[in-house]
């Protein structure tokens, strides 16, 4: 773990750890800063092992709508419903998740490669358990108000709420910082009108629990080849076909295995809850296209941010970022109504201009900050001068009073 890390999460982990110097982290992750450690013997639950505590990252941009107030509360409620999810324990007022020892599925089997049958079957078993969990079966506090939720089985309304989040929170809220970059990439408010037309007409399907982020890095293979699902931060109730679409989009199975996953998913969800795959042939492509469109805005912002974190952006880094943006824009162009995707060179020019403008804004804010600090120093100096003057006046008054007393005494 980097020695310079001194976050609240790191300090808390060190205080709870049996051996503070053996705290591991922060682990990679977008939403949280995570630390892993062993608890002292007296604090352990069950068979021991390592545990993890997590601290939400500050100033985080959320690219996905969240449903539940607490992931830990959700995991507590899911015990007995979903197999192979992390256990929880509360220590000194902090809820910890058991750390699953093993490797991510992605570390063992990269994107675009087939998932072995043993793990593939366990993924399907997880979908079987998810579709069996209905909205009324879990008593977990939600973030959104009832009026902001789609009605039961209203798949079109469910997707529209997701589009609204992308439009308002990802696109709209970031216009001050990224508006000119979006415009240079031919992305504007009309993009969402085109997207809504493109995905219109979804069939109704009964809602169930969705993991909503089921990809190779959120699936852990332990030493006995059991598959564990982690990171339930984005879980929600909604259209079961959306969970399949998200999974297929993120997993990047080879074509044959993707087709088999779709066919097996359809059979198992219909077995558990009839109607869960209704209209899948027409609707799955629409949901996949929404994921492509959503990724355009997400990846443009993330890629731009990654450039800002580099101490120096050279031509090679800028060109690599441009290819990333061009690729995601090419895949999302049709649902967003982008008729002609800008070339890689045009994307590179747009990113370079955005970086220059951002550097200018940063320097301007720094100058404003220096001026503010200067005004504070001047104000403090004036205050010190007034205080010294008052002190001198009080000293003179005391001296005069003492002199008057001496005269009276004489």
Language-model features, listed with the residues they occupy:
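ATP-binding glycine-rich loop module of kinase domains
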Residues: 31-68, 107-112
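Active-site acidic catalytic loop and adjacent metal/ATP-binding pocket
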Residues: 25-39, 43, 47-50, 195-242
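Juxta-kinase regulatory segment immediately upstream of eukaryotic protein kinase catalytic domains
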Residues: 1-25
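Conserved HxN/HPN-centered segment at the entrance to the catalytic loop
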Residues: 79-92
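ATP/Mg2+ or Mg2+-diphosphate-binding catalytic cores
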Residues: 298-375, 404-410
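Conserved short submotifs of the Hanks-type protein kinase catalytic core
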Residues: 94-104
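Conserved kinase catalytic-core helix
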Residues: 78, 106-148, 181, 185-202
């Amino acid at each position: 773990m980097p020695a310079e890390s001194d976050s609240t999460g790191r300090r808390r982990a060190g205080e709870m750890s049996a051996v503070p110097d053996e705290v591991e982290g922060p682990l990679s992750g977008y939403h949280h800063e995570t630390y892993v450690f062993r608890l002292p013997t007296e604090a352990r639950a069950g068979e021991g092992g390592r545990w993890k505590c997590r601290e939400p990252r500050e100033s985080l941009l959320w690219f996905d709508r969240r449903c539940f107030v607490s992931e830990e509360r959700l995991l507590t409620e899911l015990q007995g419903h979903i197999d192979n999810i992390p256990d929880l324990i509360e220590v000194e007022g902090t809820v910890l998740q058991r750390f699953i020892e093993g490797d991510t599925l992605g570390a063992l089997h990269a994107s675009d490669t087939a998932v072995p049958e043993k793990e593939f079957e366990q993924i399907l078993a997880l979908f079987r358990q998810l579709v069996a969990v209905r909205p009324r079966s879990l008593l977990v506090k939600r973030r959104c108000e009832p009026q902001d939720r789609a009605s039961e089985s209203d798949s079109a309304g469910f997707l529209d709420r997701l589009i609204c989040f992308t439009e308002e929170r990802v696109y709209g809220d970031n216009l001050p910082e990224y508006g000119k970059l979006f415009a240079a990439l031919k992305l504007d408010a009309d993009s969402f009108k085109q997207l809504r037309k493109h995905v219109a007409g979804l069939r109704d399907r009964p809602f169930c629990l969705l993991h909503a982020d089921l990809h190779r890095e959120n699936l852990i293979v332990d030493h006995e080849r059991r598959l564990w699902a982690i990171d339930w931060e984005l879980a929600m109730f909604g259209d079961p076909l959306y969970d399949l679409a998200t999974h297929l989009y993120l997993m990047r199975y080879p074509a044959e295995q993707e087709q088999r996953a779709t066919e097996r998913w359809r059979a198992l969800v219909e077995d558990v809850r009839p109607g869960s795959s209704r209209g899948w042939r027409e609707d799955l492509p629409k949901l996949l296209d929404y994921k492509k469109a959503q990724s355009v805005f997400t990846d443009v912002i993330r890629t731009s941010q990654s450039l800002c974190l580099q101490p120096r952006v050279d031509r090679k880094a800028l060109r690599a970022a441009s290819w990333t943006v061009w690729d995601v824009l090419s895949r999302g162009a049709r649902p967003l109504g982008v008729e002609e995707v800008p070339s890689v060179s045009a994307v590179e020019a747009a990113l370079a201009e955005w970086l220059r403008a951002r550097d200018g804004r940063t320097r301007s804010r720094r100058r404003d900050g220096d001026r503010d600090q200067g005004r504070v120093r001047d104000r403090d100096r004036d205050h010190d001068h007034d205080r010294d003057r008052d002190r001198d006046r009080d000293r003179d008054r005391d001296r005069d009073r003492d002199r008057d007393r001496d005269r009276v005494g004489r």
